[in-house]
Amino acid sequence: MPNLHLVRSLKLHGDRCWSVDISKGLLATGSADRKIKLVDVRNFKLVEELDDTAHKKAVRSVAWRPHCNVLAAGSFDTTVSIWGRDDDDYSGETELLAVIEGHENEVKSVAWSHDGAYLATCSRDKSVWIWEADELSEEFECNSVLQEHSQDVKHIVWHASRLLLASSSYDDTVRIWAEQDDDWECAAVLSGHGGTVWCSDFERAETGIRLCSGSDDTTVRIWRCLTDDADVFDKEWIQETVLPAVHTRAVYSVSWSADGLIASVGSDGVLAVYKEVQAGRWEVVARVDCAHTVYEINVVKWLALDGRVLLVTGGDDGCVNVWELREE
């Protein structure tokens, strides 16, 4: 049975850590203290603290653009900042490239498409915006404004290899979006949770489309699209399973690893890892209670590093904890 071992606890922020993202050896963090910090995952040392005057309120979400040293950060001040680095050796400074405006209320989540062509943002104003980015990450043109959620949109995530976007909302649903005839349209509405859906993540698989979601109702659910076609419109989605009950309070973040494991964290301070032991049947293979002592955990992300299976969590204690999943 695997166990989760705490590798490092980094006290990076003076207020809750909302978001983490990892790319090209750099871990980015965003916090209620308005700060964005960059950490070298090879030694877990702080590389840089970005200019905290860029945002007037909390930084709720950070996301690296694929294949380049560009970071997007969404804030409660309604804006999204874009930052760029010129080097891979972490010696240079990160510069502010652009500030994106458009949302009327707090930006809750930002996410890049797998090819880096699109940046999606969502907000308490109930909308999801899709932006086309130029190669330099300095110009952003609004491609679509999606307004079909009836409440606050909490989180967005792109599929790892398809132009599919999932948005999670206070209206208790997940919506799946895809491009059709040069417009972005809602391809499916996933209903079944009994409370706010805080998060979701797509399976990283070459065939089939599955999504996990976490909710205020304390459950993590798996959804499956009954097609493997590129065209997902007019295709049925089913709730494939509900993962074994672990959480006693809201599930704030889920992450689906490249080798098929799912991690979840939430308001109860629990970090859990699940494995599919046969098609549609999952087991809890590792669990840590009070993973950030008495504090809530807001985010979890998988990190593959030198053959090690690591997890990164961020909590209300301002800490970023790094965990290793080890076979005992």
UniProtKB/Swiss-Prot annotation:
WD repeats lie at residues 12-49, 54-93, 102-141, 148-187, 192-233, 246-284, 291-328. The keyword Nucleus applies. GO terms for biological process: iron-sulfur cluster assembly; tRNA wobble uridine modification. Transmembrane segments: none annotated. Keywords: Cytoplasm, Nucleus, Repeat, WD repeat. It is found in: Cytoplasm; Nucleus. Its main location: cytoplasm. Gene3D superfamilies: YVTN repeat-like/Quinoprotein amine dehydrogenase. SMART domains: WD40. One of its GO terms (cellular component) is nucleus. Belongs to the WD repeat CIA1 family. Essential component of the cytosolic iron-sulfur (Fe/S) protein assembly machinery. Required for the maturation of extramitochondrial Fe/S proteins. Interacts with NAR1. This is Probable cytosolic iron-sulfur protein assembly protein 1. It comes from Eremothecium gossypii (strain ATCC 10895 / CBS 109.51 / FGSC 9923 / NRRL Y-1056).
